[in-house]
Amino acid sequence: MRYARRLVAGTLAAGALALSLTGCGESVDPIERLGRKATQEPSQTPSASASATAPAPDSAGAQGGASDEAYKKWGLTAPVQYAPKPAQKPQIPKAAPGKVPVIDRIPLPAEEKIVFLTFDDGAEKDPEFLKMAADLKLPISMFLTDSVASSDYGHFEKLRDNGSASTVNNHTLTHPNLRTLSFEAQKKEICGQQDKLEKRFGQRPPLFRPPFGNYNDDTLRAASECGVSSVLLWRVSMQINNFQYAQGSALQPGDIILAHFRGPSELKGATEIQMTTRMLQRIQEQGYRIGRLEDYL
């Protein structure tokens, strides 16, 4: 239970720290940079068997790791280590009636050095990143914003379907600061993207991440009414070269890592692949394995 209490306390702190973790240092928010770009409606529809959550990987998939040589191809000096699906899921505190729980770290014992990868927005659509993610079998929880991702939802469908059990989740229609909106306006942003993602990917996403990490009680009520099961925040954000921490100066068991689908224009010339390689190196340097977030919820 002490892990559950720690999670609740951490959630309160993360709300105040979230904006600084996305908007300072080497990072530039791609939504703010791109503005309200016109995007085309996705023309494809999901197949009868498609779903927003790909089938869980077998022992050769994300939880068993990539091929022995794949890591060298992408600039790593050792294979990425993956955590198996837990025999029993951690205890997550329940939300008040009519709301959804807010999670910023998975409550794990100190000896379970496991972290989780999440990528936001969808501005960058680098085909080489698709190859990297498939080769390494990275289990990525995607949080997509329609205003930048919808110009090529097919890119993220390929990422979901690459055998790593990556998932598609909700990051609003237009990436607003939800605290500034009424309940009805928040519900439109959240439910609207739920509807679009369900239509395009075949399943209503269970997870929602508020832009900038900003939310209030209306957000939690709106998310519940839109069919969301949990609001996901984070404790660590990947910048261009290094992590930025909400607490301390190192990864902690259960940390949810925030990264973005970004390219050279947002990363000061670095590519999405270079940023991801550095992120994986930092995880390895601290002796952590990567888990599939949804397996722990």
Spans of features found by a protein language model:
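CE4/NodB-like, metal-dependent polysaccharide N-deacetylase domain
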Residues: 134, 139-141, 167, 183-216, ...
